[in-house]
């Protein structure tokens, strides 16, 4: 895989979503779950990675993040179910073991 950055969706303990971007998915997920990540996720631990999409540049990942954040919850859920072919979750699960 030749991705330089990722847009990702976390599901928080309370069922809410957190959307972000990163250049190192494994490190970013560990930071979130250690309680040192975003203020939003610190109050809603643990978080679970449910979607990750790779991009050729950080700017593309940031644009995808911004677009996704503007959607209402039903639109986000529709996107997640319709774009499983782009979801890299199974790749990360195979590479890292259980997430």
Swiss-Prot record:
Gene3D superfamilies, sorted: GIY-YIG endonuclease
Listed SUPFAM superfamilies: GIY-YIG endonuclease (SSF82771)
Source domain of life: Bacteria
Domain GIY-YIG: 3-78
Pfam families in the record: GIY-YIG
PROSITE patterns xref list: GIY_YIG
Annotated family: Belongs to the UPF0213 family.
Protein name (database record): UPF0213 protein SPD_1364
Species this chain originates from: Streptococcus pneumoniae serotype 2 (strain D39 / NCTC 7466)
